[in-house]
UniProtKB/Swiss-Prot annotation:
It is found in: Cytoplasm. Residues 158-338 form the OBG-type G domain. An essential GTPase which binds GTP, GDP and possibly (p)ppGpp with moderate affinity, with high nucleotide exchange rates and a fairly low GTP hydrolysis rate. Plays a role in control of the cell cycle, stress response, ribosome biogenesis and in those bacteria that undergo differentiation, in morphogenesis control. GTP binds at residues 164-171, 189-193, 211-214, 290-293, 319-321. Monomer. The lineage of its organism: Bacteria, Pseudomonadati, Bdellovibrionota, Bdellovibrionia, Bdellovibrionales. The gene is obg. This is GTPase Obg. Belongs to the TRAFAC class OBG-HflX-like GTPase superfamily. OBG GTPase family. The keyword Phosphoprotein does not apply.
Length: 343
């Protein structure tokens, strides 16, 4: 299924049904008193989340979604049927914005929300009967429904986000620590869409990790795949900053680390005025040196020292391919998440 994380649509609640003009028909009397019923209520627009979908691709199939209008009232004081509600099912973490970019509703911790109310049904002529007018010949029209244009923006919900250069081993890592099976190959930009994986850290403990397409220097200006997927890790508690420690592609691990952090800062600067934005550059990071199976002991010791000086904390060293230190890494990750939850 194609991954779609932004879509613009219009939503409309149903119009209320009109009231009915009707008079009783009785034997011996051609026209009895008024008995026109009220119109039915228009359907609401209800937003409901589902954890079983993770893309807006199905919603993109239509430009306009409308609830059903209420039916007209009938004689014998029968009310018209209410219009059927429109239930729009979206992934958890979907944000609804108006066309000015303001947040209308954030479906992060909410399972259901009535976004637009349907119009009220009009009163039938029986309602307007009084001592002065015993046979009113008018009824009320139904109330108009509401309509709005919205932009849906999906931000995946995960506890941990993995950031790093292409080929740092992000997809290999998430497949090693979870049941996720992203595409893995030895060339840049293998990952073209975000991947989510559930990591078990004990009998009763688990957390969700998000792997996004790799960043490169200049991503904020559109280089590579750009920074379009960074919004999917805005909700995470912390980052795994994964670094290719091998240097086999002619890269400098420390430069890669610095470049990624600079891209996060640029992303923050470009989005700081956006309502509902969560800065990324200040998010806690667990720096992880990957592919240590390609290094000698002395090379690894030297690299860890350099990273400790640069980041202010001891980096974690693993090999996602061989599984070296993976168990200890997952335990440390679980501890870090627990620490963030307590704070």
């Amino acid at each position: 299924m194609k991954f779609i994380d932004e879509v613009s649509i219009s939503l409309a609640s149903g119009r209320g049904g009109p009231g009915c003009v009707s008079f009783r028909r009785e034997s011996m009397q051609a026209r009895g008193g008024p008995d026109g019923g009220n119109g039915g209520k228009g359907g609401d627009v209800i937003i409901r989340t589902s954890r079983h979908i993770n893309s807006l691709v199905d919603i993109r199939q239509n430009k306009r979604y409308a609830a059903q209008s209420g039916r007209m009232g009938e004689g014998r004081q029968k009310s018209g049927m209410d219009g059927e509600d429109l239930i729009l099912i979206v992934p958890q973490g979907t944000v609804f914005r108006n066309m000015d970019g303001e947040i209308i509703i954030d479906m992060t911790g909410i399972s259901e929300h009535t976004l637009l109310k349907g119009g009220r049904g009009g009163k039938g002529n029986e309602f307007f009967k009084n001592s002065v007018n015993q046979a009113p010949e008018h009824a009320q029209p139904g109330e108009e429904g509401q309509e709005i244009e919205v932009r849906l923006e999906l931000k995946l919900i995960a506890d941990v986000g993995i950031v790093g250069f292409p080929n740092a081993g992000k997809s290999t890592l998430i497949s090693r620590i979870s049941a996720a099976r992203p595409k893995i190959a030895d060339y840049p930009f293998t990952t073209l869409t975000p991947n989510l994986g559930v990591v078990k850290a004990g009998d009763y403990s688990s957390f969700v990790v998000a792997d996004i397409p790799g960043l490169v220097k200049g991503a904020h200006a559109g280089v590579g795949l750009g920074i379009q997927f960074l919004k999917h890790i805005e909700r995470t508690r912390l980052f795994i900053h994964l670094v290719d420690a091998s240097g086999m592609s002619g890269r400098d691990p420390l430069e890669d680390y610095t470049d990624i952090n600079n891209e996060l800062k640029m992303y923050d600067e470009n989005n700081q005025d956006k309502e509902g934005f969560f800065p990324l550059s200040t998010r806690p990071q667990l720096v992880v040196l990957n592919k240590i199976d390609t290094l000698s002991e002395s090379q690894l010791t030297k690299l860890k020292k350099q990273f400790k000086e640069a980041s202010g904390s001891e980096p974690f060293a693993i090999s996602a391919v061989t599984g070296k230190n993976i168990k200890e890494f997952v335990q440390e990750l679980a501890r870090q998440i627990l620490k963030e939850e307590e704070e």
